[in-house]
Swiss-Prot record:
Expressed in which tissues: Ubiquitous.
Positions of region (Disordered): 1-27
Job of this protein: Actin-binding protein which may have an oncogenic function and regulates cell proliferation, migration and invasion in cancer cells.
Keyword Protein biosynthesis tagged: no
Biased composition (Low complexity): 9-27
Swiss-Prot/TrEMBL keywords: Acetylation
Assembly: May homodimerize. Interacts with F-actin.
Disulphide-bridged cysteine pairs: none
Residues carrying N-acetylalanine: 2
Keyword Cell membrane in annotation: no
Protein name as it appears in the record: Talin rod domain-containing protein 1
Gene3D superfamilies hit by this protein: Alpha-catenin/vinculin-like (1.20.120.230), Talin, central domain (1.20.1420.10)
Domain of life of the native organism: Eukaryota
């Protein structure tokens, strides 16, 4: 399904929450906020690159490799869900500003995690709505699914990379049992999705080499994962610099194995066929994707402003400039939400529509 509950992260590739624990000691809320900013920014940019900047029209699936597909939802349902989520985004944007102004960096970090998940969810829904609107135009031919969903497996790869980056970058003193648990669970969740998706692709593949290569890729990934998770268990049971360094050492092979598997799985022959749409359909799709991009760009800017504020002491000469940038980026988020809502209602770009009550000119 394309929506799910408003404001709730979707799918199994959701963040393993390194941002919720990195540097997570309560005495270091600024450090934690900086880490969350980096994670959220990377996630939002990746999803935008995959769904908004692509020239292809494809449905967006959220429930896993065996999902019946997001196409069960109508454009109208997607539109209403997205508009509801823009309202939730406005509330979170206000909350983050207020918490930061009061010096509540821990609460601001929690709100930012929620904001990042909401932006990802909103982007997914917007991309699916754009697809539905495009294929509803005359002469359009719907997309044909392939053996692999490029978006889902690429998201999983990114989450695995993020989890391994946390293990490499976190000092021993900050490797709390909670952090190690969250990273381990996140890695396991995403690796399971990749395993299931590639097993399904192997079963459905008609090519003998592809069937075997999917299986070998999964085996390689699973072996690397077992070696890394054993190191994580060891650093949890008997913390030491040696145990921590082993986590960093064995994270490399897992990242490489996942990258190789996803690289193979996303070769063109496994991805099906994008929808064929007319010029009219392309214009409708571009309008909605452009509205969503306005929201994502503003939220990325907001995240960068939060990061800058977290890194400077309150008495810093640049503090007032950073706060002004934060206010401006919050306004940009609001404007982006308005543009997206208009694009969904009009099925055209609000930037090219005549102003309300304007007189036409020849």
């Amino acid at each position: 399904m394309a929506s799910g509950s408003a404001g709730k992260p979707t799918g199994e590739a959701a963040s393993p929450a390194p941002g919720s624990a990195v540097g997570g000691a309560s005495s270091q809320p600024r450090k934690r906020l900086v880490s969350i900013c980096d994670h959220c920014k990377g996630k939002m940019q990746l999803v935008a690159d995959l769904l908004l900047l692509s020239s292809e029209a494809r449905p967006v699936l959220f429930e896993g490799p065996a999902s019946p597909g997001a196409g069960a939802e109508s454009f109208e349902q997607c539109r209403d869900t997205i508009i509801a989520r823009t309202k939730g985004l406005s509330i979170l944007t206000h909350d983050v500003q207020s918490q930061l102004n009061m010096g509540r960096f821990g609460e601001a970090g929690d709100s930012l995690v929620e904001l990042g998940d909401l932006v990802v969810s909103l982007t997914e829904c917007s991309a699916h709505a754009a697809y539905l609107a495009a294929v509803a135009t005359p002469g359009a031919q719907p997309a044909q699914p392939g053996l692999v969903d490029r978006y889902r497996v690429t998201r999983c790869r990114h989450e695995v990379e993020q989890g391994c980056a946390v293990l490499r970058a976190t000092p021993l003193a900050d490797m709390t049992p909670q952090l190690l648990l969250e990273v381990s669970q996140g890695l396991s969740r995403n690796l399971k999705f990749l395993t299931d998706a590639c097993a399904l692709a192997s079963d459905k593949s008609r090519d003998r080499f592809s069937r075997e290569q999917f299986k070998l890729g999964v085996k390689c990934m699973s072996t690397s994962a077992s070696a890394l998770l054993a190191c994580v268990r060891e650093v949890k049971a008997a913390p030491s610099e040696l145990a921590r360094s082993r986590c960093a050492l064995f994270s490399g092979p897992l990242v490489q194995a996942v990258s190789a598997l996803v690289g193979f799985a996303t070769e063109p022959q496994f991805l099906g066929r994008a929808a064929a749409v007319s010029t009219e359909g392309k214009a409708v799709q571009t309008a909605i994707l452009g509205g969503a991009m306005s929201v994502v760009s503003a939220c990325v800017l907001l995240t960068q402003c939060l990061r800058d504020l977290a890194q400077h002491p309150d008495g810093s000469a640049k503090m007032s400039d950073h706060r002004e940038r934060l206010r401006n980026s919050a306004c940009a988020v609001s404007e982006g939400c308005t543009l997206l809502s208009q694009a969904l209602r009009e099925r055209s770009s609000p930037r090219t529509l005549p102003p309300v009550n304007s007189n036409s000119v020849n």
